[in-house]
Amino acid sequence: MTESVKKIAVTGAAGQIAYSLLWRIANGDVYGKNTPVELQLLEIPQAIGGAEGVAMELLDSAFPLLKNIVVTDKAEVAFDGTNAAFLVGAKPRGKGEERADLLTANGKIFGPQGKALNDNAADDIRVLVVGNPANTNALIAQHAAKDIPADRFNAMMRLDHNRGIAQLSEKLGRDKNDIEKFVVWGNHSAGQFPDITYATIGGEAISGLVDHDWYTGEFIPRVAKRGAEIIEVRGKSSAASAASSAIDHMHDWINGTDGQWRTAAIPSDGSYGVPEGLIFGFPTISEDGQWKIVQDLELSDFQKDGIARNVTELEEEREAVKDLLG
């Protein structure tokens, strides 16, 4: 081990996603195998016992890279000196609750967490919001963190990206590692737009290998609604796959993608007609610790419609929480 210790915060630490996520972090899957880590676990008071039990198991796993664990119900403690934060904990939608109610309820979680990050985190802080509705929760946290650059707040759409890659690999009977330039535009919701326009497998255009009706009638809705499908089959929401995708996102953000495209939900700079500031899924590459939107792509009317639908959806979400954006 040659590098200084990195502090990594995880909220919702007693939950199912965190239970998979924390072991990957402790194993060195975010910063690498030469970087020791400290884990800072945040939970609500009612679930602090669960988080303490998770910490006990982490200690028992004797990870060489894991140097310390803090368990707390105070955001200012969890985010003290934090270099990377996974904001996983969020309020699930209750029976009969509208999406606007859910947005407001989560705003009361992510606003204070954004402020606590602003006041306590390290200068190189990177924040990935996993808790849903992730794009708008990230927007709320970002607005509350006035001194942190906006591009340090991302929402997780890597799960959607990975789901799309897996479905294409299965359909084509080809190695998923050969798939390039696939992207999911927009919101982490059932309205997202998985796009194969530029995607290739082993250098071949995927759009020429699959039927258009399959693409629009099966692939797009299956990727967009995969979470609901898993709940139907498993009886619980996606947890391990969400954790794995969160690791993928943060690892690539920090370490780069070697020019390969990844889907990342980041603050828009106005590219492709997406209003500046919306946290939106784009085709990106990571270089020097920053996501950069792939530029100068030609868009068909079909693509423009898919992007526009997501812009409308995210603008409506932003309007619903405008009082929380300060």
Swiss-Prot record:
InterPro entries: L-lactate/malate_DH (IPR001557), Lactate/malate_DH_C (IPR022383), Lactate/malate_DH_N (IPR001236), Lactate_DH/Glyco_Ohase_4_C (IPR015955), Malate_DH_type2 (IPR010945), NAD(P)-bd_dom_sf (IPR036291)
PANTHER family for the chain: MALATE DEHYDROGENASE
GO molecular function, one term: L-malate dehydrogenase (NAD+) activity
Its biological purpose: Catalyzes the reversible oxidation of malate to oxaloacetate.
Disulphides: none
Enzyme class, UniProt record, top EC level: oxidoreductase
Gene3D superfamilies membership: Lactate dehydrogenase/glycoside hydrolase, family 4, C-terminal (3.90.110.10), NAD(P)-binding Rossmann-like Domain (3.40.50.720)
Coiled-coil region(s): none
UniProt protein name: Malate dehydrogenase
GO biological process: malate metabolic process; tricarboxylic acid cycle
Keywords noted in UniProt: NAD, Oxidoreductase, Tricarboxylic acid cycle
Binding site for NAD(+): 12-18, 106, 113, 130-132
SUPFAM superfamilies: LDH C-terminal domain-like (SSF56327), NAD(P)-binding Rossmann-fold domains (SSF51735)
Active-site residue numbers: 188 (proton acceptor)
Binding site for substrate: 93, 99, 132, 163
EC number: 1.1.1.37
Organism superkingdom: Bacteria
Family: Belongs to the LDH/MDH superfamily. MDH type 2 family.
Catalysis: reaction(s): (S)-malate + NAD(+) = oxaloacetate + NADH + H(+)
